[in-house]
A protein has these predicted regions:
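Bacterial N-terminal signal peptides that target proteins for export
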Residues: 1-8
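Long, hydrophobic N-terminal alpha-helical segment
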Residues: 20-68
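Flexible, charged surface loops at secondary-structure boundaries
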Residues: 36-38, 80-83, 136-139
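Structural motif
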Residues: 41-44, 59, 85-89, 121, ...
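Ordered, amphipathic secondary-structure segments that act as subunit-interaction surfaces
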Residues: 83-106
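Glycine-rich, aromatic-bearing surface loops/beta-hairpins
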Residues: 101-180
Length: 180
């Protein structure tokens, strides 16, 4: 019994140390992984209550960092690469959460709007986005960066698309291929 308890304590200590190492090094991990990510991969910046998903392709990292800072860093890193471009999704619920139920939500919405001012984020119900990640995670890699934010429906989901080939170019190609 004592040996089992000691072993359990050691496992818990090692797990905590690993989590601490992961949270302090999420930026390096993002920089290393970004060149490997491509079209159909996702990056999600999520609040602290976001669930740990179990699809094999989903990797979750606890950043222990400010939510808006993580969003800024991800967009900064994405701006430095040419091979992918972000398609941004936010929770539909974000627009409806009242300040009286979630203190700080108004300031968050305003700050997020400034960060996303040059983009066109799409809005979908939270459960639909989780389902999209779950499905994509069966085949493609999903990087989930969990932050210390405790305001609901504040996650930002980024589906990566090809940075050097547009949807219009793909459509023209498919049309040309259909013609004899």
């Amino acid at each position: 019994m004592l040996k089992m308890r000691t072993a359990l304590i050691i496992v818990l200590i090692l797990t905590a140390a690993l989590a601490r190492a992961q949270s302090s090094d999420w930026q390096s991990h993002l920089r290393e992984e970004l060149p490997l990510l491509g079209h159909r991969n996702w990056i999600a910046i999520v609040d602290s209550a976001y669930p740990l998903q179990t699809s094999t392709g989903i990797e979750t990292i606890e950043t222990n960092s400010n939510h808006l800072d993580v969003i800024k860093e991800v967009f900064d890193q994405l701006s430095k690469v040419k091979h992918v471009r972000p398609v941004i999704f936010t929770d539909t619920e974000l627009k409806a959460v009242p300040e009286t139920d979630a203190a700080g939500i108004t300031a968050y919405r305003e700050a997020l709007a400034k960060l996303l001012a040059t983009s066109e984020p799409q809005s979908l119900p939270h459960e639909q986005i989780i389902a999209k990640l779950d499905e994509a995670g069966k085949t493609f890699h999903i990087l989930v960066l969990k932050t210390n934010l405790t305001i609901p429906y504040t996650s930002v989901f980024i589906r990566l698309d090809c940075g050097y080939w547009t949807a219009d170019q793909e459509k023209r190609l498919r049309e040309k291929m259909r013609k004899p």
